[in-house]
Amino acid sequence: MIIRSPEPEVKILVDRDPIKTSFEEWAKPGHFSRTIAKGPDTTTWIWNLHADAHDFDSHTSDLEEISRKVFSAHFGQLSIIFLWLSGMYFHGARFSNYEAWLSDPTHIGPSAQVVWPIVGQEILNGDVGGGFRGIQITSGFFQIWRASGITSELQLYCTAIGALVFAALMLFAGWFHYHKAAPKLAWFQDVESMLNHHLAGLLGLGSLSWAGHQVHVSLPINQFLNAGVDPKEIPLPHEFILNRDLLAQLYPSFAEGATPFFTLNWSKYSEFLTFRGGLDPVTGGLWLTDIAHHHLAIAILFLIAGHMYRTNWGIGHGIKDILEAHKGPFTGQGHKGLYEILTTSWHAQLSLNLAMLGSLTIIVAHHMYSMPPYPYLATDYATQLSLFTHHMWIGGFLIVGAAAHAAIFMVRDYDPTNRYNDLLDRVLRHRDAIISHLNWVCIFLGFHSFGLYIHNDTMSALGRPQDMFSDTAIQLQPVFAQWIQNTHALAPGVTAPGETASTSLTWGGGELVAVGGKVALLPIPLGTADFLVHHIHAFTIHVTVLILLKGVLFARSSRLIPDKANLGFRFPCDGPGRGGTCQVSAWDHVFLGLFWMYNAISVVIFHFSWKMQSDVWGSISDQGVVTHITGGNFAQSSITINGWLRDFLWAQASQVIQSYGSSLSAYGLFFLGAHFVWAFSLMFLFSGRGYWQELIESIVWAHNKLKVAPATQPRALSIIQGRAVGVTHYLLGGIATTWAFFLARIIAVG
């Protein structure tokens, strides 16, 4: 008998060569579906092809295969992102005035696109200063490049090439992990290992390496730039890394190396890891030493967080245990069963992630202007407005996406048999109470918020300003918001040792910061006007939530259609025999939710744009007198609907409407074109399918008469296709119109 030592158990987590690589198959449209692969009978085929190409649930019901497809697609997505980034850096290297901007960021505008003269397009190349003619960019790339220590266009070239290499690598990884070594389902469901890698690896080591880059490269280079040293004279990044004496000249404690760290004498590092608060008066951005400190702290937190969960060693938390331990006195089974949901339904997982990421994106929008992180960002008003608007729209779309995937989870992945009395079941059982209360809140907010405006418009029209809600008549001060502002303004010196200013100048208390005669930031006053528009925000957000939440909670069943789950995620009506059952699918709720999301975000960006032009942005004279772009008219003008129309939309549209013949004329054309795209959507939203089918049939008759009828039968768009085309053009047209309006205005006056 041979005694063997037990073999160590190694889990095999991948399948080798599971699916052969076949270009013939890829070249066949609809290869993922037996029906679509047959080819087109009617024009509906092309719609189904697009609708189902990425709906992996419809290709197979095998969770492992779905997981692999999603995983592989993520690498494709990353590849596109790297390609896009490479393009941005390449434009910076090849077509931009980055080096000129770097030497004088207050007088030279950022430009990274020069239009070729074909039939007069060169009119678009405006004078951005320093003798450079090009299109002014508003993406903030120049500011982030300066903050990271890029001093030449050669460095941008190298980064662009590096990004292309990574794009190729990602494409390869996507192919490799689907066709050559595809992970097993168990790998996708190993949440503790995933948390370990994402928290400690991605966020922890990612933040740590960025903090290291900031300390060793960004800080010294920015120190030189702020002192007015010519970028060409500044040592290159690798010289700072390899030569400690260079850094020690700027930060003497560098000479001591890591000794203070191991002897716990950390205060030695306070030269370059600071906790100041406020803005750097030279650049109008956050102190880069504060930012480096922040990333170091974040890195420590996430490195610890990444080691809290139980993986191969039997210590640490298990997510399943944590969830099942969450039981309150009134919550029945509590979170029991949520673990199974989140590891078997990627829609449920995605829904949570989208809700979190969407909220985070909106938080980013609000911090980019109140705590501008990059040098010379705060005085670049066009970029500030663009970044705010961009992050608000993205956040809105992500949150609607969260509701969409929550509803898909409810329809496709929810299994009522093993859900009893846990939190989700309890929410579903009192959904009527939730939705009816939410409905009441929406009615209350709608009537009261608009009622205040209508009152003001009426009093204004009757010439009774003393009876209006305003800062000079009947005041409705946002006292709670002002209290929060005050608390933050008084916080420095009380909360953190050595903190000299509050987190943001907007809280109040501090002086204003101006760079090159332009206001970077100052305390933002809040008054009656903000109180009114704030309640419009509350109203539009609650209506959006009402629509989306109703779609999720009634996705499987309702009193009207008890068997809704059998009809799927999107369906036009419940059969011909039941009137009044159209537009009730979960998909239709997402469709309607998108319009209200558009309403909500529009009011937010209008509020921001006008408020900043009126109360923050402007120029400052040698005597210290601030002249705001619209002269502080927000408080008195925005308290009536007429004021919004006259003093915001109409008054500020003059730049885009009069842009023809100037370098801003493209915005004028976009403004016009995007209005057309928006109007085009109404044709799809306000018409019936039957009307178009009749029209198509008479056109087909004419084609048959002339013997030019195609083999593929034309079909009118289905009800759902029509609504999809409608909402797409509505949003695209509306967003592009707003974009052109904002940018023509702010580039002209900012």
Curated annotation (Swiss-Prot):
Entry's Gene Ontology BP terms: photosynthesis
Residues where phylloquinone binds: W692
Magnesium among keywords: yes
Annotated compartments: Plastid, Chloroplast thylakoid membrane
EC numbers on record: 1.97.1.12
Binding locations of [4Fe-4S] cluster: C573, C582
PROSITE patterns for this protein: PHOTOSYSTEM_I_PSAAB
Subunit structure: The PsaA/B heterodimer binds the P700 chlorophyll special pair and subsequent electron acceptors. PSI consists of a core antenna complex that captures photons, and an electron transfer chain that converts photonic excitation into a charge separation. The eukaryotic PSI reaction center is composed of at least 11 subunits.
Function: PsaA and PsaB bind P700, the primary electron donor of photosystem I (PSI), as well as the electron acceptors A0, A1 and FX. PSI is a plastocyanin-ferredoxin oxidoreductase, converting photonic excitation into a charge separation, which transfers an electron from the donor P700 chlorophyll pair to the spectroscopically characterized acceptors A0, A1, FX, FA and FB in turn. Oxidized P700 is reduced on the lumenal side of the thylakoid membrane by plastocyanin.
Entry protein name: Photosystem I P700 chlorophyll a apoprotein A1
Gene name for this UniProt entry: psaA
